[in-house]
From Swiss-Prot:
Residues 34-37, 195-199 are annotated as: Interaction with substrate tRNA. InterPro entries: Dimethylallyltransferase, IPT, P-loop_NTPase. The lineage of its organism: Bacteria, Pseudomonadati, Pseudomonadota, Alphaproteobacteria, Rickettsiales. This is tRNA dimethylallyltransferase. Keywords: ATP-binding, Magnesium, Nucleotide-binding, Transferase, tRNA processing. Its EC number is 2.5.1.75. Substrate binds at residues 11-16. It comes from Orientia tsutsugamushi (strain Ikeda) (Rickettsia tsutsugamushi). GO terms for molecular function: ATP binding; tRNA dimethylallyltransferase activity.
Length: 345
């Protein structure tokens, strides 16, 4: 057995459900390729697989990276804490002192994802099972399929130096300093993109080279030699928007989601920039701060999720793939015609 399935597509398109179906049919194992579902403290708001789903089928690379700059779980567990105890328990922690003391260079990267995913894929194939990679993060999927440019590791000292500088300056001031050091980055990075600005600044400070100078090297696919089958889900836009709205409304009216955000809210300033991009977090925090009603929070979050889904839909439509592209107007059409025709006939 040398096959690998990759199921990709926009959020709320039905990827996880299809992955479960195929895993049950073909003795498969599910491997995450969603940049938000890696985080362990926010499984509900990121719509990660449920405990029941994980019990039915083996899932890997879900909910295993901390959203915090350091591993706050060493200080106080996020599991099994009742809502009434949250504030009292967390107020007893000298968080600033602990975070400074335990700060690590555990920031996740695409390169780390590819390394972990390839290791799991090899193990799954060795066990004569089918690896099914599932997600909507195009950067993860492309890096896994086509390869990634290797950039030298950034030291913890440089990372802290850049983080401190970013906090002291406005975004525009930081952007100007980056352009002064790395003029090439002006052609590729916008001043509103904090994550990419910080990354580019770290690289030029560490290596004295632009991050984009490393992009000239030839890419080699980590999955070379395997039979990779890609399945891209492209639902009708109105169906996609409907799925986005329904899923977040269902999550937001679930008390467990609010509890999840209550637990991380006191430490918001210590959450990594990438984790703060998880859709819905900021709206639920605004609700908890009494800045929005729950209805307003849901409406604003739904709008942002639809906008994100639209961008994903456009991106996946423009991809040239060696595999299957499934177009459908309803979820029943996806399963009764498209999936049946491709996998079960």
């Amino acid at each position: 057995m040398n096959d690998i399935f990759i199921i990709a597509g926009p959020t709320a398109s039905g990827k996880s459900e299809l992955a479960m179906l195929l895993a049950q049919k073909f003795n498969g194992v599910i491997i995450n390729a969603d940049s938000m579902q890696i985080y362990k403290e926010i499984p509900i708001i990121t719509a990660s697989p449920s405990i029941s789903e994980k019990q039915q089928i083996d899932h890997y690379l879900y909910n295993y990276v901390s959203i915090f700059h350091s591993d706050i779980n060493e200080l106080n567990s996020f599991d099994n804490i009742s809502q009434s105890k949250v504030n009292a328990d967390y107020n007893n922690i000298n968080l600033q002192q602990s975070i400074t003391k335990h700060l690590t260079d555990r920031r996740y990267s695409v390169a780390k994802y590819v390394q972990e995913a390839c290791k799991i894929i090899r193990s799954v194939i060795h066990a004569l099972k089918l690896p099914i990679v599932v997600g909507g993060s195009g950067m993860y999927i492309n890096a896994l399929v086509y390869g990634i440019h290797h950039i030298p590791e950034i030291t913890l000292e440089i990372r802290m130096q850049v983080q401190d500088l970013y906090k002291k300056l406005t975004k525009q001031e930081f952007y100007q300093k980056l352009i002064d050091l790395d003029p090439i980055s002006k052609n590729y990075i916008h001043s509103s993109d904090a994550q990419r600005m910080i990354r580019a600044y770290e690289v030029v400070l560490q290596t004295n080279k632009s991050i984009f100078s490393y992009h000239n090297s030839k890419l080699v696919s980590p999955l070379e030699g395997y039979n990779v089958k890609k399945i891209i889900l492209l639902p009708d836009r109105q169906l996609l928007y409907q799925n986005c709205n329904q899923r977040f409304a269902k999550l937001a009216t679930n008390g467990e989601l609010v509890d999840e955000i209550i637990k991380i809210k006191p430490y918001y300033d210590h959450i990594s920039i990438s984790a703060k991009k998880a859709l819905g977090i900021n709206e639920i925090i605004s609700y908890l701060n009494q800045e929005l009603t729950i209805e307003e929070a849901i409406t604003i979050a739904q709008q942002k999720i639809r906008q994100y889904a639209k961008r994903q839909l456009t991106w996946f439509r423009n991809q040239t793939i060696n595999g299957y592209t499934l177009h459908y107007q309803s979820m029943s059409e996806l399963y009764k015609t498209q999936v049946n025709d491709v996998f079960f006939n």
